[in-house]
Structure formats: structure tokens, C-alpha cells
Amino acid sequence: MTMDRRRFLHSAGMCLGGLATFGLPEVRFATAGDTGRLVFVLLRGGFDGLAAVAPTFDPAYFDLRRTLAAEPDDLVALADGFALTPGLAPLRGFWERDELLVLHAMAIPYRTRSHFDGQAILETGLDQPEGSADGWLNRLLSVMEGHRSGIAIAAGMPRSLTGINEVASWSPAELGVVEDGYLDRLHLLYRSDEALQGSFEAALAMQDVGEEMAAMGGGGRQGDPSALFRAAAQLMTEPGGPNVAAMEFSGWDTHANQGIVGGNLDRQLGRLAAGLSSFRASMGDQWEGTTVVVMTEFGRTARPNGTGGTDHGTAGAGFVLGSGVARSSVVTDWPGLKDRELFEERDLAPTLDTRAVLKGVLAGTFDLTPQQADRVFPDSSGVRGMWELMT
């Protein structure tokens, strides 16, 4: 068997050089019978939920946001007076198919305006920044029934996927070159071992994705989420591919020049929405049973700052997309935007716990019981999962 594989794929603790010394970790792969798939997308930096999803019905909104409030006619109406910024217009298609949940006034359970602490809590699933180093996605792999496997579509390993379960990683970055003859010898070495051979072939399949994307000019730059979403879809639809994935995008810390319609944030949200639409299209028939969750570590201040942006806040917005959504809706217990209703008189007040949302998503996507969901999110037994979100 001759293999023309020039690029080096690396996964968590796994490289082709490590294969030669039997350093390959035990990576568990999904079978054709597994239908549940989850992609967790972390927007690092704290994106402005009030800009992304405007509560046009709130009488305080336009006075409060001033220069960062778009005209109502420029927004994409959803329901109950909530509307999307124009950049998120591609999500309207998900909405019309009953595949979109818009989450608002949502926050992690710990009050912080620190990126480091906020991301740590969101990725570990805990209620404080100190504690287990394991990520909640890795714990999910421990409680899921049947075969399962995880992958990070990122330059590094997100904390959400770290833990006792071995997972793979894929990045479009060039990680080195391996001679074809070396790969041929590795194939001969491992073809007699079913487990090692399967992992080796899966690694090469992930490498092929990178080569194909490079040939198409879609290397997955930070400014082009669509390329990474297409890669995620290709990896997850491969026979035996992963069914739990983590992705991340930075650049959401908009302290200055945030803009409104057509501005910096609106354009960045447009690239995200285009990527999500591309992912759905690339999944094909396997979109059925797939769920995508988009969250950020915190929202932004309700009032603009003096440099045309917003500062670190508390509650914000997020999204759940998937075929298993019960029905499209805006999920919130709206707290209001009057001064007395703001958290510490500056931020959108939190009324929705990220863990409650995620428990409901996991139950609907992987048929987890409440007890299993509590194992994914330790010390959260008092947080009721939103089981009604998914079918």
C-alpha cells in the first residue's frame, strides 16, 4: 500500500513519531450506530450579547445603548421583540426550521469580569475558578453510553476537553513533514493490531482534511471560521469519526470601535454565522442528531464606554443550533435594562445558568439522565437542567 501523505497530523499526546514507539493513546471512536454529535464553540473575549441580540421591546434599550443601538428596521426580527444584528442574518434559516435557541441574560455561576476566571469556569463546568483541571467535555466522554470520541478543532487543546479520556486535536497549521516511506513502514507495523491500525487510519484521515483544505485555499485562518467549520464537519462525518468536538474563536473583547450595522463586531458575527451555516450544509444527512452550542465567558457592559466599545460585563447571549431543538425560541427570563434592574448598576443581570442549558442539551443530544448530567457538572445538583429545550 503506497500512501502519499506529506503533512504531519498530531493529536493529544499522539504524533507519527510516537506511533513508532507504541506511544499511541487509546482513542475511542464512534460507530455507525451513534447518532448524537456535539460541537461546543467558545467565543473567547466576551462577546456583546446586547449587540448580537437586541431587546428592542425594552424601553430602556435605545437610550442605554445610544451610539451602539442599531435602528430597528436594520435588525433581523425573531420573536417577542428580540432581533438579531444583520451579521447574524444567516441564523434566520435555522430559526425558520425550528433549529435555533437564542439564549439571553445567561451567565456562568460565578461573578467575575476576568477572562481567565470566566473561561476556566465555562470550560471546567464548575462554580468557581479553582478546582478540577478536567473539562466538562472530557467528563462527558466518561458518562456517555456506547462508543465515543472527542476532538479539538483548535491550535491547542481547549481546557474543556482536557482530562482522563484521550482525545485528538486537529489544526490547519503545518506541523512538520513526514517521508512517505516512513508512513508505509508504520502501516506495515500496525496493520496486524486492529486497535492501532484503526487509530492510524483515523489519523491519516484527519491529515487528509488538512491537505484538501490547503488545496482549496481554506486553511482555517482566524478570520475565516467557515474553513474550520467545514473541517469539523468532514472529520465528524468520516466513518468512525469523533462525535464530541471543541472549537474556539478569539477577538471578541471589543473595548473600542465596536460599531453597529456593518461595524467590526457585526462583521465578525457575520463570519461566525456563515461558518455555522457552512457546518450545517457540510454535515449533510448527518446533521440529524447534531447539536452546536455557542457560548462566551461573560457579556459586556450595558452602556458604551468612551472609545466606541464596551467593557467586561456579566450576563450575555449564546446559541444552541441543531435538529433536536424542540422549537426555535428566545430562552430568557428577561431582567430589564433600567438602572435598578442592572447588575451592579452596569451589566445585564444574569437569570439563566450556563449549566442548566448545557444539561438540557446533553440530555437531548446523548440521552443523558439527570444523574449523568450532574457528573458532567460537579456540585450542580441544585441546578435543574432545562430538559424542555430539546426533543
In which residue ranges do the predicted regions lie?
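Histidine-centered active-site microenvironments of extracellular/periplasmic hydrolases
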Residues: F298-S329
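Feature for exported/extracytoplasmic and membrane-associated proteins, marking the mature portion
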Residues: M1-D285, A317-T391
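Metal-dependent active-site segment of extracytoplasmic phospho-/sulfohydrolases and closely related
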Residues: L276, R280-T307
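Short glycine- and Lys/Arg-enriched binding-loop motifs that mark or flank ligand-binding interfaces
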Residues: V41-L42, M295, N305, H312, ...
